Amino acid sequence: MFSMRIVCLVLSVVGTAWTADSGEGDFLAEGGGVRGPRVVERHQSACKDSDWPFCSDEDWNYKCPSGCRMKGLIDEVNQDFTNRINKLKNSLFEYQKNNKDSHSLTTNIMEILRGDFSSANNRDNTYNRVSEDLRSRIEVLKRKVIEKVQHIQLLQKNVRAQLVDMKRLEVDIDIKIRSCRGSCSRALAREVDLKDYEDQQKQLEQVIAKDLLPSRDRQHLPLIKMKPVPDLVPGNFKSQLQKVPPEWKALTDMPQMRMELERPGGNEITRGGSTSYGTGSETESPRNPSSAGSWNSGSSGPGSTGNRNPGSSGTGGTATWKPGSSGPGSTGSWNSGSSGTGSTGNQNPGSPRPGSTGTWNPGSSERGSAGHWTSESSVSGSTGQWHSESGSFRPDSPGSGNARPNNPDWGTFEEVSGNVSPGTRREYHTEKLVTSKGDKELRTGKEKVTSGSTTTTRRSCSKTVTKTVIGPDGHKEVTKEVVTSEDGSDCPEAMDLGTLSGIGTLDGFRHRHPDEAAFFDTASTGKTFPGFFSPMLGEFVSETESRGSESGIFTNTKESSSHHPGIAEFPSRGKSSSYSKQFTSSTSYNRGDSTFESKSYKMADEAGSEADHEGTHSTKRGHAKSRPVRDCDDVLQTHPSGTQSGIFNIKLPGSSKIFSVYCDQETSLGGWLLIQQRMDGSLNFNRTWQDYKRGFGSLNDEGEGEFWLGNDYLHLLTQRGSVLRVELEDWAGNEAYAEYHFRVGSEAEGYALQVSSYEGTAGDALIEGSVEEGAEYTSHNNMQFSTFDRDADQWEENCAEVYGGGWWYNNCQAANLNGIYYPGGSYDPRNNSPYEIENGVVWVSFRGADYSLRAVRMKIRPLVTQ
């Protein structure tokens, strides 16, 4: 076996050597040596080597690149390009997402801006309307102030003329007395004090010399003008608007406002800042945010020195202007928590009266009425106070007979920034007015009594501590504590009240109107003056609080009374005469059913009737109550909110009851009191006599509802003569009215109806009645009131039972506003059960007897302004 291997090896070596040494043979010569396709054997390791060198041109013939190398290069480049493309795609998706979010956010912002611009535009328009309305009201107030100033100047001239006449009269009397001394057995020793007249004239001239009119710089109010800005975008930027997105173009559609402040009488125009804020942009001037306004009225009253700034009340101060009556002697009530220069309390400027040297509370329509005296500013001839809540009258006049205490302390009032407003007031009461039962003459102070009657003098003083606490909810609690000294031992040096130095002294002259006939009796004898206090004193009450102010209906009910800080109230019970027998604190003044008492006391008049007055603690708390309003015309003239229609409290003449009525102040001249209304048929008007006597139904604050006021009230309201207004409306919306002079009799007279002097568009159905049936049978004039349980008509049967409601029936009707309410208008009487008759809400001369009206109203107002 081994030998065979050796043999094979030898043969192989020999063959190889033979082949290598042999030359070209015939095979190669015949072309057998041509290179042809060969079977390529793949090596497993060929493509595993990734580090192949590049093929150059020189190497291409004998060393070419392999397909594996080419594939590797292609894959590498492809992967690189794929990565780049994916990166670009991711960036594109992220940009699209951000762009979408940005667009959504921009759209939301634009919607918010549109809403804000629209709200700002509405606020600008509202501000423009309110400012114009405020300016017009201020102009009206300025005109009223000028009228009052002119009235004051006229009264001052009259006072001066009367003073001259009185001086001349006293000189004439002195001449006559001197002339009869030679012929008379006994003459009166009398001296004429002309120096006192000269002093009074000088003081009066000083008062007249004061300029009450507003200063020239305040005669013309600035005018605020608001107008839209025409070109919001400057011209050089308009071309760029074409390139902006549509949502941004929407900003140019929002109108912007420009505010300008023009001062009449000058060329100065004050504009606000130049910045606009889209719709309703307003340009404002810098202002003090803590001040609610400023009104420097200058010298606004006789004897007033310095400026009062009631609008700028400072920290914790509030200022409220509540207009009052437009009638004579009443311009409203201004209560300022920060009273201004020279004042330490509330100032209630109103209507100064002739002879007064301060400022009076409004609501004083009577000549010579003193009203509510709270002046503490510098006043020529008088710097005292008169607080009606305590009733203390503290004169400080240099006139004869008056002396100021050595330690005057008329009270202090402090407003703090918190909710607690402490105040302390000391009051000193001096000698009192005392009269004896046998002498009808009232004397004051230490004046000698010429008759045989006895006069006593008493002194008392009191110290009042008032603390006002305002809670976080706005509730205001007033606590008062008064310490009274009956013997006057704790008083400082007291002053004489109204002491007269002799006949002809004019000490009380400034507190009374010279035109009154009882003027001379008042000056010489000291008698109380009826009507000295305004019947409308309590109608103007302003509650000044640190958080605001509010007003209400300032009338007392029968069972309980509404107390208002700073304003005293009359007790509603007790009737007293004008001559008081005994006093324990100060003077009483009476007018009709109303009594003003400065302190709590028991008072007996000459007839022996007594009226008890209430107080707090051991104090003698003052109560003052004005005459309540009688009707809606009175409300219109005196109530702070009387110019607006609504529900008000009134007190009927001749009655002690106070009740609520609805006043229509918008129709015609205003002052209409609603006495009957039908609107929807929700209330049955087929009622008893007692129901119609007392009234029934109800109204809401807007005057909607069905009701009948009551025949008793109609009688009391129409005793002095009234105007009846009947308003009718059919189902098509057509309206008509009828007006009559109107009066309703008493219950003893059957509440008889008296009408005359028809005017209107509805036709005269109450006097002329129905033309077809004749006025004799259908006129309602002079007819008594009838109900189904009390028949007073002219028909043999009961008209009220048949026609469905109480009315002033004849035989039977041409008008019946209390009939059965049929919706729709025209109705067929044959369908009515149980009586087939025209018993709807009818006014024959307007729509016929077979047409039931949709709405009817009956209103009354005084025939003449009372």
Swiss-Prot record:
It comes from Homo sapiens. One of its GO terms (biological process) is platelet aggregation. The modification 4-hydroxyproline is found at P565. Disulfide bonds join C461-C491, C799-C812. There is a cross-link at K527, K558, K575, K581, K599 (Isoglutamyl lysine isopeptide (Lys-Gln) (interchain with Q-?)). The modification Phosphothreonine is found at T412, T505. Keywords: Adaptive immunity, Amyloid, Amyloidosis, Blood coagulation, Calcium, Coiled coil, Disease variant, Disulfide bond, Glycoprotein, Hemostasis, Hydroxylation, Immunity, Innate immunity, Isopeptide bond, Metal-binding, Phosphoprotein, Secreted, Signal. InterPro entries: FIB_ANG-like, Fibrinogen-like_C, Fibrinogen_a/b/g_C_1, Fibrinogen_a/b/g_C_dom, Fibrinogen_a/b/g_coil_dom, Fibrinogen_aC, Fibrinogen_CS. This is Fibrinogen alpha chain. Ca(2+) binds at D791, D793, W795, E797. Its main location: secreted. The keyword Cell inner membrane does not apply. The alpha chain is normally not N-glycosylated, even though glycosylation at Asn-686 was observed when a fragment of the protein was expressed in insect cells. It is well known that heterologous expression of isolated domains can lead to adventitious protein modifications. Besides, glycosylation at Asn-686 is supported by large-scale glycoproteomics studies, but the evidence is still quite tenuous. Most likely, Asn-686 is not glycosylated in the healthy human body, or only with low efficiency. CDD domains: FReD (cd00087). Residues 1-19 form the signal peptide. GO terms for cellular component: blood microparticle; cell surface; collagen-containing extracellular matrix; endoplasmic reticulum; endoplasmic reticulum lumen; external side of plasma membrane; extracellular exosome; extracellular region. Residues 68-631 form a coiled coil. Detected in blood plasma (at protein level). Residues 262-460, 543-638 are annotated as: Disordered. PROSITE patterns: FIBRINOGEN_C_1, FIBRINOGEN_C_2.
